[in-house]
Amino acid sequence: MIDIEIAFIQALQDQAAWLLILMQFFSFLGQPEFYLLIIPAFYWCRDPRLGLRLGLLMGISGGLNEALKVVFHLPRPYWVSPDVRAFGSYPSFGLPSSHAQGAVTFWGLIAAHVRRWWFWISVVAIILLIGISRIFLAVHFPADVIVGFAVGAGTLLLFLALEGPVGRRIARLPLSGQVFVALAGSLALALVSVSALATLGDWQVPASWAAGAIERSGQPIAPLSLRDAATASGLLFGFAAGAAVAWPKRGGMCAVGEWSVRLLRYIFGILVTGAIWFGFGLLIPEDPGLTAFALLYIQAAAAGAWVSFGAPAAFAYLNLADRS
């Protein structure tokens, strides 16, 4: 099966080499950095409720993806085959594709919100192109992408089914209870990845995978690291806890106003988000130990809380937004 998938990737790269820049563009549309730029734009400047839903869903989806990668612990194409060209490098396992999964959850939720047939067609095209881009870049097998689509669809459907009843129950809790639920949920999400790693026992990454990755991309791999799991769970906690403080009776976020004001709001908010992210990043050691895990969690939680609560409060103070 792997040989067939490698042959498919090789043929795709050979027959459509001119598509490289386009494929890199669509791959970026599935990057975590893209979501970190777009979700605040919805939350601060367009539709706070949709931004809130997107932030919560992407945090849950990201944490689930990290756990599933460890459960399956399968390689990426360029780790195992010299016949493909590595147009990207990633240290984590390959299946399921986080880009494919994230594309379905992110764009699918927006499409469910917009409810226009033409938008659904556009979303399906974007999702498929993101998946194809990952195969073209040789960072995923076709099976990785297909499973990512399936997991993303399942996650999205569960979220749509449960967000109403679960959200109403959480909304009836006092603020302390809501923050506790956010903390417990994020730690449970991290625990899933920790438990998945524990099930591997003394399994080790094959030396040939590590050597192949370095040979073909120049970058080392660290698929047994839980750094991404810590980041996903921290973002979920910070974003959810901040929203509990800001939403809805305690002020919320008012996204109306002139577009020039919204632009200033976004630029200021994103600059502070970047300062928080990269400032904390200077404190995080490269080793995969508990200290690094805790600092990654705190870094992500601080960024998430700034987006959902700190920034709206700052906007109101600076007269860039009104309390709603």
Predicted ranges, named:
Residues 1-22:
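Short, strongly hydrophobic alpha-helical membrane anchors
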Residues 14-17, 41, 238, 301, ...:
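Long, hydrophobic alpha-helical transmembrane bundles and adjoining juxtamembrane helices/loops
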Residues 23, 38-39, 44-45, 52, ...:
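Membrane-embedded catalytic cores of phosphoryl/pyrophosphoryl-handling enzymes
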Residues 26-36:
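The first (N-terminal) embedded transmembrane alpha-helix
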Residues 53-77:
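The feature marks cytosolic C-terminal regulatory regions of anion transporters and related permeases
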Residues 166, 248-250, 312-324:
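Membrane-interface capping segments at transmembrane-helix boundaries
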Residues 257-261, 288-297:
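Interfacial loop-to-transmembrane junctions
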Residues 293-308:
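Small-residue-rich transmembrane alpha-helices that serve as helix-helix interface/gating elements
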